[in-house]
């Protein structure tokens, strides 16, 4: 809901955050989605702007929610491993979109488009899966 998102972004501003995004996809998902456009409230340089993100504007294929849903924990795990290993598809695009937004909002890149492209390159490289495996190995040692 736009009113809730506006209230949340104002709370973040009042708490002193310098950069933030609050998003709701038109399909009701509380993150950026490739299934629909998303309403965004962005805090940057102490200014709040509101706009819409269309995944198709970033060369991401639009799909239905059923294309990215999983039924079991095992399916979710396997789907996640495929994405982290660079397998293209709706899940890959969904992760690239949200990782790109994270890179953008954390000032790692200048634009959402640049963030998405950087996220795609990283996913294709296989490094995210290597990091996950290192993390898993480390947590089993402690």
Where are the language model's segments positioned?
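Glycine-rich anion-binding loops and their surrounding alpha/beta cores
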Residues: 1-142
């Amino acid at each position: 809901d736009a009113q809730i998102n506006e209230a949340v972004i104002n709370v973040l501003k009042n708490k002193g955050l310098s950069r933030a995004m609050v998003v709701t996809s038109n399909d009701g998902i509380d993150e950026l989605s490739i299934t629909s456009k998303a309403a965004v409230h962005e805090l940057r340089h102490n200014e709040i702007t509101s706009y819409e993100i269309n995944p198709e504007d970033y060369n991401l294929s639009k799909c239905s929610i059923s294309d990215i849903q999983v039924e079991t924990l095992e399916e979710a795990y396997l789907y996640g491993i495929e994405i982290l290993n660079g397998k293209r598809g709706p899940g890959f695009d969904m992760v690239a979109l949200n990782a790109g937004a994270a890179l953008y909002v954390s000032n790692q890149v200048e634009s959402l488009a640049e963030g998405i492209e950087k996220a795609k390159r990283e996913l294709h490289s296989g490094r995210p899966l290597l990091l996950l495996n290192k993390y898993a190995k480390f947590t089993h040692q402690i």
